[in-house]
Amino acid sequence: MMIPVILSGGSGSRLWPLSRKQFPKQFLALTGEHTLFQQTIERLVFEGMDTPIVVCNKDHKFIVQEQLAALKLETQGILMEPFGRNTAPAVAMAAMKLVNEGRDELMLVLPADHVIDDQKALQRALALATVAAERGEMVLFGVPATKPETGYGYIRSSQDALLPEGVARVAQFVEKPDEKRAAEFVQAGGYFWNSGMFLFRASRFLEELKKHDGDIYDTCVLALERSQEDGDVLSIDEATFACCPDNSIDYAVMEKTQRACVVPMSAGWSDVGCWSSLWEVHEKDDNGNVTKGDVVVQDSRNCMIHGNGKLVSVIGLENIVVVETKDAMMIAHKDKVQGVKQMVKTLDEQGRTETQNHLEVYRPWGSYDSVDMGGRFQVKHITVKPGASLSLQMHHHRAEHWIVVSGTAEVTCDENVFLLTENQSTYIPIASVHRLRNPGKIPLEIIEVQSGSYLGEDDIERFEDVYGRTSTPIERGVSVKTIAQ
């Protein structure tokens, strides 16, 4: 059986402001009813393909579990990284887990946030790649370069009579080129876009990783030994993983190994890595415009207009991207959308929170939506799922007022436990130990008014939490060196 390894740790910053660090693009429904993450797993349900291993950031654990449960999709485990260290360590942890379990199978490594339109073409490429991988080769899926795209890395192929027909040896990896050089690649032929998809046997990858980047290999061995398992979730040891070098599969292994080969894949692939890529994969109107939401377009061509609540009207635009969300708007020329990543970096440096979360934030117990905020107050609309509860917690700098809009709330405030129903309210003083729970069968909705000198989400001390959310040593400011000792 072939085992997919879904890499779901990306931040998707080039699709800001829709994609945020705490809710990145792989968890958004950008090209259909289901999210990119869900689509990735759905397209791998066919004969000969086992259920996948998912590698994700710890902050996305509950999003992954919810999106899997929503479609009744199964996995054989979730590897939870405390923070990203690029793709080489992520794949190494998955490979080591399989080998340790006596399952030295072929691993199909693929990102969670790509689009593939032609399922049959994908399966044909997989069949060809399997022949090479069974012989010990390390296969990369290359998309034939049909235009001078500057947002992708390129692969140059060469013939090798020892490889199966249709499989080529990788002669060269090329960094993202400028437009002139990219055009030369397309004209020359034999160049492919690097899809970021790979196929190899688990033990072969580990053998090559140990040979070419022993620091990653050794650190991952130790991190796996120290990891904690809870059901199907493996939490990678934070202190050890912090010492792991940050490197991609390409740099750590594929550019150094003598076994790298490429299989052509013409399957309607896109990494939807920027707004112009997303425009390309969508259906367009007669003027080449792509619109979503409450949008009115007049005398405009080849635009991407995305509304999310407000009416967005545009007049006389051409090749422009407009994205509106509740708390941010981004306007860019389609030729300049690669600059969105730098814009996000600039906003981060300015301490802007709009890069981290949407106003509506999802939690394992439900969600909250920031309705209004001032210097010493914040108003939230909180929804708690039936049977769910927030952690038993305390805030050092803020008090809270709760008003029930619908449903029934079970409130714990210090030693008191009581019920509130629609239109009833209560007050939670600063430093009171409290909890909100929904004992009913319908969603609980409340309005929460916070007031105090500091209203950040990190002003929280948890005493009990059914979801296992506890402060980590690094979050408490303890150094990695101290932990390692």
From Swiss-Prot:
It comes from the Bacteria. Its EC number is 5.3.1.8, 2.7.7.13. InterPro entries: GMPP_N, Man1P_GuaTrfase/Man6P_Isoase, Man6P_isomerase-2_C, ManC/GMP-like_b-helix, Mannose-6P_isomerase_type2, NTP_transferase_dom, Nucleotide-diphossugar_trans, RmlC-like_jellyroll. The keyword Disulfide bond does not apply. One of its GO terms (molecular function) is mannose-6-phosphate isomerase activity. Pathway: Nucleotide-sugar biosynthesis; GDP-alpha-D-mannose biosynthesis; GDP-alpha-D-mannose from alpha-D-mannose 1-phosphate (GTP route): step 1/1; Nucleotide-sugar biosynthesis; GDP-alpha-D-mannose biosynthesis; alpha-D-mannose 1-phosphate from D-fructose 6-phosphate: step 1/2. The keyword Nucleotidyltransferase applies. Its cofactor is Co(2+). Keywords: Alginate biosynthesis, Cobalt, GTP-binding, Isomerase, Multifunctional enzyme, Nucleotide-binding, Nucleotidyltransferase, Transferase. Produces a precursor for alginate polymerization. The alginate layer provides a protective barrier against host immune defenses and antibiotics. Belongs to the mannose-6-phosphate isomerase type 2 family. PANTHER family: MANNOSE-1-PHOSPHATE GUANYLYLTRANSFERASE. Monomer. This is Alginate biosynthesis protein AlgA. The gene is algA.
